[in-house]
Amino acid sequence: ETIEWSLQVIADQPCPMAMIPGNHDCLIEGGIYQRHDFKAIPNLTFITAEDGEMLWIEEFGVAVWGKGMVDHTPNFSPLGGRPERPADCEFYIGMGHGIHVPHGEPSHRSSPIHMAEIEESPFDYLALGHHHAAMKLVTNEATASYCGSPTDTVGGAATYAIIEIEKNNGTKLEILAVPGTETD
């Protein structure tokens, strides 16, 4: 029932959408993506390739790259193999599902995303998922974030992110609380 509701919410959006699998819904035999028809949603592209794949939203000049998660292990590199910026796109968005690892810190956690990888990425914006608390990862080299969760209050409120990418003006990122969810 929750999945069907979620699919309808996505289908009701007036814009193209992209999605990658995460650690709770890996691309496993008999998993959620085999039990429900995500491809039936006309405005959704589900990115599943283990090595990553590129989606083009030509009407907006946008290229989106992401990678399907088959197994949530320390060997899975969510940003590994990301291609350089395509020459003919106006905006380049990346998607990755894993745990942020700050500069100089080791990690034995599954699906690590090192800050150096974020800063070296060619994306105008990098959308990250894994933990439910919102986190901005903005430096002179990169703009990335975990948007948080619109359904729970880990970190003080249910949250979502608004990203504006302007051709000659850079990327603006704002994390907002869903009204009425602040826990103070």
Where are each of the predicted segments found?
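His/Asp/Glu-rich metal-coordinating catalytic cores
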Residues: 1-159, 164
